[in-house]
Amino acid sequence: MNEYSLTPVQEVDGLHIKRDDLYAPFGPGEVNGGKLRQCVMLVNSVKKDYKSLLTYCSIHSPQAPITAAVARANGMPCRIVYGGTTRESVAALPMPRLAMKYGASIVLAARSGRHSILQARAKELAAQENSFIVQYGINIIGYGDTLLTAVAAQTENLPDDIENLVMTCGSGITATGVMIGLHRYGKRVKRMHLVATAPDRRGFIHETLKKYGADREFEYHDLFHSPGFVYEKSAAATWGGIRLHPHYEAKTMQWFRGSGIAPESTLFWITGAEPRSPGQS
């Protein structure tokens, strides 16, 4: 399977599931899914102009190992910029450990892990070594066509008529790409449910959809601001034996199970699965 292959839609215990987690070019248990595909296509489009890759993110984000794996596949050095953490935490946590397994070096660049502070440090570091910066959610500014087209193409094999489409919304890039694809391939989705595990991206989503002539209504379910929600806290959920990502789809599945929406009328979009960390069986 390459980055242009369609991942399957499976019917599991009455629920249609888009299995984008099955895009796993580096093998079972490794980094996978739609965000990996976006990173692969992004780096393919820029690698001739840069010597190395660099990303900055939360120590819990799969963006670090995804970037590291793509860098290794292209023979490029990779640096991961973290803030507000320690060497001990980096050595113990699964995402930094996996990034290091793929050959990335870790830079503890700031006392704070705030996005704006890490972004400024990343720009300084990138300028020193002609590094391309892979940004939060995978770069949308300047590379929108590449990324959104990669996502939109995956809607081609969805059923033509869907009553409810349920998916996680973080940066909003995948959700936006899906809705562009629904428009492009004439898929009729009655209710689009975005379950948010990050700050509100509705403005960005509508603005981007308008540029592609694909703006539409969607229902926005805000988990991020709900009482007790913590991004870093894992959730556990499975469906028909499919183990869902503890930071993303597992939380969306917990919401779905309590929503009253019938599985038989729903397509559930899985963007990716949690990769195994080093030492994990």
Give the ranges of each region predicted by the language model.
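A short, small-residue-rich loop immediately preceding and capping a beta-strand
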Residues: 49-68, 74-83, 164-171
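Glycine-rich phosphate/pyrophosphate-binding loop at beta-loop-alpha junctions
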Residues: 144-219, 274-281
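Active-site-adjacent helical/loop segments in soluble small-molecule enzymes
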Residues: 123, 219-264
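Phosphate-binding loop/pocket of nucleotide- and phosphate-handling active sites
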Residues: 257-281
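Gly/Ser/Thr-rich loops at beta-strand to alpha-helix junctions
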Residues: 57-65, 87-88, 167-177, 248-252, ...
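Positively charged, low-complexity intrinsically disordered leader regions
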Residues: 1-51
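A glycine-rich, Thr/Ser-enriched phosphate-binding loop motif common to dinucleotide/cofactor-binding enzymes
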Residues: 27-39, 134-156
